[in-house]
Regions:
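Conserved, structured C-terminal
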Residues: 1-218
Length: 218
């Protein structure tokens, strides 16, 4: 649908934009900058323009079929995709390896905290952020629920939502690394009731990222 909207507005250059690329152009005669990135795990763009042009751009997109969505929908989709939110899933105390973000470190450059990370580089993280999938469609995790393993408390959920693409509730959780294995079963304490969840070490939805990386015109 997004590609059809772009084409209808004479902005086919958006459809030619490669994944993780940024370009400037026009949509409905409005100068914009578009980035081919995704916070929800689908092919699309993040588009910015001058504030004075925002209403005109919005109206042009709306006339061609684009529809606004709420923040809860966006949050649910990013939890399905395993995208972490700063302040919810990660913060200044998070070690990059715990979040699977150590690949972003440039050891050839200097940065704040480098010496501390170098000292810890030889040891495996004691905690990991994972996805949790619930088979019970009726449970309603909200985040910050205790996660329980065979040995007792092993962590907590950090974000949660109903995953409409999966058809199941999903959550992100920071848990003891020994439980961070695909298909490991853990319990979530929901208001005193233990509910089973399955561990997924990557994104619960589209783990390869094919949907958001595919050619926008495909």
């Amino acid at each position: 649908q997004a590609t059809n909207v772009a084409s209808a507005l004479g902005a086919d250059w958006l459809n030619d934009l490669g994944y993780f690329r940024t370009a400037s152009g026009e949509i409905a005669d409005v100068p914009v900058t578009a980035s081919r990135v995704s916070y929800v795990g689908e092919a699309g763009w993040e588009i910015s323009c001058q504030s004075r042009d925002a209403v005109r751009l919005y109206q042009a997109l709306f006339r061609q079929g684009a529809r606004p969505v709420g923040s809860l929908a966006v949050s649910a989709m990013r939890v399905e995709k395993g995208f972490m939110s700063y302040g919810h899933d990660i913060d200044t105390d998070t070690v990059p390896a715990e979040a699977g973000l150590d690949f972003t470190l440039d050891w050839s450059s200097d940065f704040i905290g480098k010496s501390a990370l170098q000292m810890a580089a030889g040891s495996k993280p004691t905690k990991r952020i994972v996805s949790l999938v619930f088979d019970d469609e009726m449970v309603t995790p909200l985040g910050n629920e205790p996660v329980v393993g065979k040995g007792g408390l092993i962590g907590k959920t950090t974000s949660a939502a109903f995953g409409y693409r999966l058809g199941k509730p999903v959550a992100l959780a920071l848990i003891d690394a020994e439980y961070a294995r695909d298909d490991e079963m853990v319990d979530i304490d929901l208001a005193g009731c233990h509910v089973a969840a399955r561990v997924v070490t990557g994104p619960a939805f589209d783990p390869t990222g094919r949907r958001m990386r595919k050619a926008a015109s495909a």
